[in-house]
Amino acid sequence: MAIRRLTEKLHISWLVAAWCLGLTVGVIAVHHLPRSVEFNMLALFGGIILFVPVLVWRWRALLIVAVISGGLVGLWRGELGRAGLEVYDLLIGKTAVIQGRVLEDPDIDKKGQTVLRLSDLRINGEKLAGQLWVVTADKRPIKRSDIIQAQGKLTAGFGAFSASMYRAKIGIVERPVPGDVAVGVRDWFAERVRKHIPESESALGLGFLLGLRRAMPTELSDNLKIAGLTHIVVASGYNLTILVRLARRLFAKRSKYLAMLSAATMILGFMAVTGLSPSMSRAGLVAGLSLAAWYYGRTIHPLVLLPVSAAITLLVNPQFGWGDLGWQLSFASFTGVIILAPLLHKYFFGDKEPGTFRQILIETLSAQIVTLPLLMMSFDVVSNVALIANMLILPFVPLAMLLTFASGVLAVVPMIGAAIALPTTWLLSYMIQAANWLASLEWAQMEVNITWWQCGLMYAAMIGAMWWMKKQTKLDLIQVNIVE
């Protein structure tokens, strides 16, 4: 009986998921292993050879072989990803002039300094691997995709950044022609929104709709962090999911093809406007895979979707897996929404369909539970008002996005633009006041410090709890689809 179960054939998706899980672990593990060019090629060939019997026989017993195969290929890809990074060992601690392309929209830190993320690096005309974190007091209007020259002392990097440069002096700033067209369209639209809506309110609305962060007042940005609301004003899976669901539902009854095309256009357009940050890369990939499955009448199990999407993002950029907190939090919150949330609802409410309020409550709570250990380990602080803040604000985010969009589109139409801007301002003002009030409470946040092994224990407990709820409810998670 045991042998029959071990030789039972599985659907190919489970074997691919196991392989992707191994690849993810392999890429992450490379960062903690010594470099070895000889082993690198052996790992690639070994991984390919091991996966052949997995594809041929598809036995349950071969799941572990699939994981090992993926792990070996992951080691190979991770080693390729850190090729050339050894040069930073010679550069750290020295003053250097580095040219690079601005990868994401610039941020403003608590001191009012500009934070830049550079890729396509060059030093003395030679290509330099990796990405650079730059902090500067320069106030010039630098945009995504600009080519800049930064001079300063290099210090050790963190996460996906190979090195950091603080108090950098910015020299040449070049804007390619035509440059990043999506940024130009976005900035043009943002100006239309600001025509009739006050600064703070327009900044919040544009944060919802376009992921714009730089224009947001520092005080409002800090209060949103304290209230646990940062995720709604950066380009995230939540904002993208709202847009994709809207596009699909508008056309689904008329034409499935038109619904798919409009939703896919929304995904590509939103990613072009907001940029390919780690969290946005994950969100776009997951939304695209889920949309394709819906269009072809298929379903993807969350336990397949998670490792597959993680592996694809790491194949594209293995540095995401080397301590990039945005990448980690993105997958943690996604796990909460597509696995923990359905289990909690089934466990406590049975087969009763969730209303909007209950769905938001459970999904928000689930995302916060799964991201909590990472947040405590990384920031040593926890928001005590996050759940309240999300319940007060999250239900109105889709309406705020719609009104902000309408305000921008109709801004040039006399009277109508101002008429649309009025309720938009009222709604956004309510959200700002709610966030400010919650952030002002003495008990709004507390300091908590945990170690990596305590973080691991917390996640082990979560996995155990989810396994228990799955066993008790017998919920089939394959029914979950984020685009429906």
Go through the PLM ranges and name each one.
Residues G26, G100, G152, F208, ...:
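Divalent metal-coordination and catalytic microenvironments
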Residues A18, W59-L62, T218-A386, I450-E484:
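Hydrophobic alpha-helical transmembrane segments in multi-pass membrane proteins
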Residues A2-S13, L21, A160-V286, L291-A292, ...:
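Aromatic-rich juxtamembrane segments at the membrane interface
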Residues T335-W443:
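Alpha-helical transmembrane segments of multi-pass integral membrane proteins
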Residues M1-E86, S162-Y166, R282:
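N-terminal leader/targeting segments
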Residues L103-V185:
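OB-fold single-stranded nucleic acid-binding module
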Residues A2-V16, C20-L23, L33-S36, G417-E484:
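C-terminal regulatory/interaction regions
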Residues E79-Q99:
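Alpha-helical transmembrane signal-anchor/signal-peptide segments
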